Amino acid sequence: MVSNAARLILAEAEAKGSNLHDLADYAAVQINDTHPSMVIPELIRLLQEKGILMDEAIEIVSKVCAYTNHTILAEALEKWPISFLEKAVPQLMPIIRELDNKVRAKVADESTYIIKDGLVHMAHMDIHFGYSVNGVAYLHTEILKLSLIHI
């Protein structure tokens, strides 16, 4: 589903005249929970297929995706075993690893890493590679900032 949606977003943007470097002028992706988080690496992958280099693809996607958190319960934030994702979406794992490397290069706090303890933390990917992060209420946003991303 995520791949189909990402392909449609790119096709519609191109049909409207986007060169994809300006994708944020043509599309916004609202990630309303952690299960659609895979749109981030999938959009990056598709942009790379179109000839856009990884760093620029990451920058483009970071201007297109925004994340809303609907809960403050840690157990509701999806975490997927690397071993599962390597089988289910092997084409996305190198991208997820690169995103994690970028986070590790700029953030010392291990609790915010995308890959930790053999798991891929979807909310962390959304937070680090989206242009906006918010909760459904001001209190949710503040708790999210303090407990998950430590700002």
Where are these regions (language model features)?
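Short, hydrophobic/aromatic alpha-helical segments in well-folded domains
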Residues: 5, 42-46, 60, 129
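Conserved small/polar residues in nucleotide/adenosyl-binding loops
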Residues: 149-151
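Short, glycine-/Ser/Thr-/acidic-enriched flexible segments
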Residues: 1, 34-36, 71, 103, ...
